[in-house]
Amino acid sequence: MSQQLLEELGRRQYRTDIPEFRVGDTVRVGVKVVEGNRERVQDFEGVVIRRRGEGINENFTVRRIASHGIGVERTFLLHAPRIDYIKVIRQGKVRRAKLYYLRGRTGKAARIRERR
């Protein structure tokens, strides 16, 4: 009984406005941030280095290089209500499902070819 209830709740949370994107793509994720009584949308742009899970539990990790060359990674639930939008900026061409090797690279070594 509880499994059916969980599946029903999951179906209500499903989002249909999510674009198709893969590992290696550069995306811009709009995250809703609450500050006091105000709510605003904060952009986080970077390369998708991982997608995992399926259904309502699917998530993805985005990596970007912040100021002073420090890498920042954020993991988002794909169907989370906190995500306002996801925009695909650039489509990358990679041969791996997980791009963890980018953690050890900076600058030109961390570039990804563009998919046509």
Curated annotation (Swiss-Prot):
This protein is located at the 30S-50S ribosomal subunit interface and may play a role in the structure and function of the aminoacyl-tRNA binding site. It comes from the Bacteria. The keyword NAD does not apply. Pfam families: Ribosomal_L19 (PF01245). The keyword Protein biosynthesis does not apply. GO terms for molecular function: structural constituent of ribosome. PROSITE patterns: RIBOSOMAL_L19. This is Large ribosomal subunit protein bL19. Disulfide bonds: none annotated. PANTHER family: LARGE RIBOSOMAL SUBUNIT PROTEIN BL19M (PTHR15680:SF9), RIBOSOMAL PROTEIN L19 (PTHR15680).
